[in-house]
């Protein structure tokens, strides 16, 4: 049975298995609702001072170092996703490491059980050959920012095609069978869908009409964020057709171009960045929720509009009357995620934490709850997922990476810089220990 969450200004009411529970909240000194506990400790899955890359052989490692293709101080993890094998084996945890510089030996990896001095060892996925050309082979993977794993055991990979912000290959969407590494689908974006030397595709969001275990996950729309190109691309997988959405709602706001995290600031003007959609079965018109990283506006548009190419032939004037400005946060929000009951989660920069908003309520500060605050462990949540485990329980998984220190050059590799954390959705929303 689904858990149903009702938010009001001061109370969270839960109806679960026929019983009703409530939990009061306290008014936070920044004007947000917050639970009474000061700092939330999520379950620590991984932490590292730096990333530990494994190689097929010691010779491969030495070659990468010699050619400048591996710089231990260059990589930065951006996203995380989890695959629970149907056989009941231990979950596989995947991370992305975009090639901001030349020194990233591979851009998509999984965590092993091998612990090394700086953290758990990574290994390339699907294998080293997919990454070793460093942009010379566009049938491989060049630079992956984020991924999404579906309920059919497939990984949807958005490859920006860049290394050190230079376009080597066209941006592409690659769908791999996780168990076999077989390519199930590939779509290279046509030139009309991206802006050469400007675009940078960083986030895919896949909305699937025929999910597993009974469906094949082939009827899907994919929304691909292009923050530097200030827009996003919609891709109809079944018909292999795409169109671009770009207007004032997908742009950055200069007033939010300065990002401050834990007292350190950097400048970044990024447009469209993160997506979520209305879950099925809630009785609502389904919407695509999106926001720009360098903006405080939360925007929505009906899925039946954004998924129809007939609306998108008039440039920046296309379908303007269908966009809904839900509200403004007054602060930047990075990676979002959505629970099955309609709680929109996002990692805010200030205060440093995860906020929740019930989509049945207006997007106001009274209805945005500070669910987890931790100025140490949650410094820039660059990847955030809601994943259903084999027991049917929803979990929040995230990666935090202290992005401000990478931008300012103050990363201290004697400290823990990167974390993968998780918490049950029920525990997060109820303020219980993870």
Segments (PLM) and residue ranges:
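Cleavable N-terminal signal peptides of Sec/SRP-targeted secreted and luminal proteins
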Residues: 2-20, 173
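Beta-strand-rich domains and repeat architectures in extracellular enzymes and scaffolds
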Residues: 25-106, 145-146
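Surface-exposed loop and turn segments in beta-propeller and other repeat-based domains
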Residues: 38-71, 119-139, 183-199, 242-267, ...
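Blade-loop segments of beta-propeller domains
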Residues: 76, 107-164, 187-192
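Beta-propeller blade signature
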Residues: 106-116, 170-182, 232-240, 412-428
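Short loop/turn segments immediately following beta-strands, especially the blade-tip
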Residues: 111-117, 179, 237-243, 301-314, ...
